[in-house]
Amino acid sequence: MNRIVVVGNGPAAHRLVERLRAHGHAGRITVLGREEHPAYNRVLLGAVLDRTLTPATLALPIVDAEVHLRVTATEIDRTRRVVRTDTGDEHPYDLLVLATGSRPRLPEIPGLGGERLQALRTLADCARIGSAAGPVAVLGGGILGVEAARALLARGHEVTLVHPNPHLMDRQLDDVGGRLLAERLGKLGVELRLGRRAVAYRRGRLVLDSSDVVPAGLVVACTGVTAETGLAVRAGLPVRRGIVVDDRLRTSDARIHAIGDCAEHDGEASGLIASAWEQADALAELLAGGDTRYRGTRTVTRLKARGIDLASIGSVDCLESTDAEVVTLSDPARGRYAKLALREERITGAVLFGFPEAIAAVSQLHDRDLPVPTDRLALLLGTPAAVPGAPAELPDDAVICRCNNVTKKALTAAWRGGARSVPELARATRATTGCGGCVDDVGRLCGAPADRTEHQEEGAA
């Protein structure tokens, strides 16, 4: 089992190689990447688009592997155990990991195509969008669509966000949360067309099903992704929404695994970075001889949009459950809203809008499956004495940075070693360099203010 070939060079593949080496794998690892860039954190593309970060800061650390860029794997010969590429090369493997990711699902709109229609998936996409001038329409009001609209607004564009559902981020937010998000975006300057679909594109204008016309020299599609399964299909591996894997992240061929956006586990192909990283961690441990199992990922989503503090935990369905205790705090005058769904004193779902102090506490309680404090209001308001999930009150093994699996103990050790600011802690531990959602938590832990621009530019390099 010395030769491992990884098809794909995104965050999941990079994390896998890092963890394999950390577990002591000394064999040959070959990585085949389609893009021209070395591995980078695509989760933060929105921050590049709004100029908070530069493209260089998204680069992930160099790994100990033979990395091939600008190559596409075209065929798996399972009998000979080799992967063929479009360059004509063959790469033999003892174990093969498919981390092929996903591709944007572009809408078919009469009159729209070519340079007028753009996805936001790669650094190259980011550069093309960044070079555009004039009004922009964003299709899709999910997480990526909201982040893209906010980023484009920050660049000075006139932005219209078109979403077919009545409220934004409908997979993560309830009606109230979606309405508050729409109000906040509207106040910032984003034009919203909710409950509408684009039906045509004519002379620089997007025509909606309401007959409204939206000016758009460029249309950015944030309308979902499709798992890249073609290689697996050609190899005869079972594929549904993604490449089907078991709890050991194996396909029907015991020598072939799949992780990340391309994988379907237990009927789910989440497309979330947290799932990709947890799968990479689990697979690395398994390939190193461990006996772990991947059982799914607890979903915590934090919007990365300048000036908006919003997090969603679990499924929106949990918030509407009739057999759960639901705690709601609404403060419309200050643009704040919180909703918790509890079952047996544990958090099963949450929406937190405008409560940055509570996000860390609620996330930790959810992650660790801990009972919530009796004083629910104190939890939401972030009252330190009543919040066992606050960073300073957490046990040493609590994970502060989910993206890079950085514990409070590791951060404390780095702080004692001289890393006294958020950027210094980022360099020492890589905390905050994933999705950026733990910046405030790390800042509170070290008693330093969190400057998001400074921490990410220095920490993610």
List the predicted regions and their residue ranges:
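Rossmann-like dinucleotide-binding cores of NAD(P)H-dependent redox enzymes
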Residues: P135, G145-V199, A276, Y294-A305, ...
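Local cysteine-cluster metal-coordination motifs and their immediate loop/turn environment
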Residues: D397-L411, R427-G447
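Glycine-rich Rossmann-fold phosphate-binding loop(s) that bind the pyrophosphate
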Residues: G8-P11, R34, R121, L139-L144
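FAD-site-proximal beta/loop scaffold in flavoenzymes
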Residues: G113-G134, R202-V207, S211-E278, P371, ...
